[in-house]
């Protein structure tokens, strides 16, 4: 934050490919203390797939929810989106963190993910959510191989026609290492 970040993303459950899930209690215990320390000082994005974690974080002062499951993991997350109207990232991913890389199959990754977002937007609107605090994340590295990731980066502008801001997460991405042939990415 002191180096220029406008927001810090905090999460208590790893969602990197191959990771194992943690229960709600474990996840909350991992983030509760840090949120208490920083949420009033620094804008916080809460990275979670669980509605109760989202609601607890929002009540503490979290400014944005980052749902890497794209509203797919916990059916109650859409109620949080409707109730609180804070910015909410809907990320594209397939499967679960544990198996997503095995499910990296697309006819055309750009169009398939575009259709995925169209379906999520229809779902949101069908639930009576009118606000536009939605951010779309094509999920670089989440259920995608090197070719998929590169095509998404090259063609990310296709998603602008959906009418929402686009977020491209780039933390610790293995494909950067694969391209650069360096181990420090």
What are these regions (language model features)?
Residues 15-33, 37, 43, 51-52, ...:
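Active-site-adjacent loop and "lid" segments of alpha/beta metabolic enzymes
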Residues 5-6, 43, 118-133:
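Phosphate/pyrophosphate-binding loops at sites that engage ATP/ADP/AMP, CoA/4′-phosphopantetheine
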